[in-house]
Amino acid sequence: MKIALVCPASLPATQFGGIVFLSIDLAREFSEMGHDVTIYTSDLDFANGPTKFNKDLPRLEKFEKFKINRTHTWFSVKLYFVNPNIYKQIKNDRPDIIHTIGLRSFQSLMAWFVSKQTNIPLVVSDQGGLTTHPFLKQSGIFFKLVYKIQNFFIKCIINDSSAISAANEYEKEIFLTFNKNSKIKIIRNGINLKTLVSQENFKQKYKIDNKFILFVGRFSKSKGIETLLYACSIIKNELKTQNVSLVIMGVDFGYQDEMLKLINMLKLNDNVIVIKNPPRDDVIAAYGQSEFLVLPSHWELSPLVP
């Protein structure tokens, strides 16, 4: 079977988060089963920031047993990446089935257009962006209007889909608010343990002598880093614990400057190690050597950490 996986970002932009890992894992598993799998995506690369696109990335790249088809992003608004040529690429390749991930994306809109025009079955998944995202409540009038327009198209995509894959019962209920008759199957997110092996000595590389607690994620207000730093301050000042460090690994999504100021204000510079834009291998190595991982997010749908 010829399978098209459609998503806003893919390799090498691992810092984008769960959608990247979900699509890669699906592509890996489907291709191992003998299917012809292509990921259609943007050319986001995260080399210099969360909205940096790279024309030098291969347009078509073979990775393991599947392919990644990248088209250039003309412009972006927040995490909405507009790469119109993705429509032509999917349509010309004539897949047997299209599976799109991340319904607030331009890429899902294009996948729906192709499906509707060619009668190719459409499977949809999301990864936390439908109704629970804090941007929906915190944004100004313009973006609230944009989200309402998006909701119209999301409802169309859901109504026309052949099947919906939800990560858990909570996400299933969110989908049902758009269409009570949706064909929903709960397929929980998994982790490929083979990808969680690293030869890197993380503590040696970053000169960490203490035991450390680990946070991995976007530097975003919604990830709860502020709460984590105040907790770290309590551990240091009230519990008088000096031999444990906090390692924060991730990429800036608008909160980095405020986070660094808070670290300085709480006098945690000697206790907190911030690693910006870490290589994936370093992240995996950190998982193995940390005492434990913390997930202080204000909300999560079905987190793909690690």
Protein language model features and the residues they cover:
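Short alpha-helical donor nucleotide-sugar binding micro-motif in glycosyltransferases
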Residues: 277, 285-290
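Carbohydrate-associated surface elements
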Residues: 170, 190
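Glycosyltransferase donor-sugar binding loop
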Residues: 46, 191, 216, 245-260
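Nucleotide-activated donor-binding/catalytic signature segment of Leloir-type glycosyltransferases, i.e.
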Residues: 258-281
